[in-house]
């Protein structure tokens, strides 16, 4: 049995997959990606210019581990607390538009497909790509 995504550190894998998605150049990033906040509980837009690739890599990893998942499930995962000033904080979901656009971009790359029962799941090609990148990450961490 080969190396899977579960065998490597999630942070290093997500960074490696984001670099792969950026290097492939096939993913279409929306023009509003530089000015948008990722949720209504954020005060600022992301500092990282490549946040779209990082979010796509994170969603791919999540779909590898827990598939299928829809837009609503992803908004729950990336949700956090909203600070209301003097009023107590409350949980708030993240942006559904961002999750939907990332999933659509991954569908154009043939990494993700719609599931018959609802939500999205990884394609066999997507699973192969993720396993290959996980093996590369494992090799890099071994050599250090």
Swiss-Prot record:
Coiled coil regions, renumbered to chain: none
GO CC field: cytosolic small ribosomal subunit
Family matches, as Gene3D superfamilies: Winged helix-like DNA-binding domain superfamily/Winged helix DNA-binding domain
GO biological process: ribosomal small subunit assembly; translation
Source taxon at top rank: Eukaryota
UniProt GO MF annotations: RNA binding; structural constituent of ribosome
Keyword list, A-Z: Ribonucleoprotein, Ribosomal protein
Family, per entry: Belongs to the eukaryotic ribosomal protein eS19 family.
Protein name: Small ribosomal subunit protein eS19
């Amino acid at each position: 049995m080969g190396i899977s995504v579960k065998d490597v550190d999630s942070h290093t894998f997500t960074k490696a997959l984001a670099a792969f998605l950026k290097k492939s150049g096939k993913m279409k990033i929306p023009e509003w990606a530089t000015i948008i906040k990722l949720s209504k509980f954020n005060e600022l837009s992301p500092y990282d210019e490549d946040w779209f690739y990082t979010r796509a890599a994170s969603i791919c990893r999540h779909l590898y581990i827990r598939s299928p998942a829809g837009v609503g499930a992803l908004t729950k995962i990336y949700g956090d607390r909203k600070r209301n000033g003097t009023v107590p904080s409350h949980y708030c979901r993240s942006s559904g538009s961002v999750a939907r656009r990332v999933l659509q971009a991954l569908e154009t790359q043939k990494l993700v497909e719609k599931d018959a029962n609802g939500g999205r799941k990884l394609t066999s090609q997507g699973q192969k790509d993720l396993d290959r990148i996980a093996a590369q990450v494992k090799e890099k961490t071994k050599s250090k």
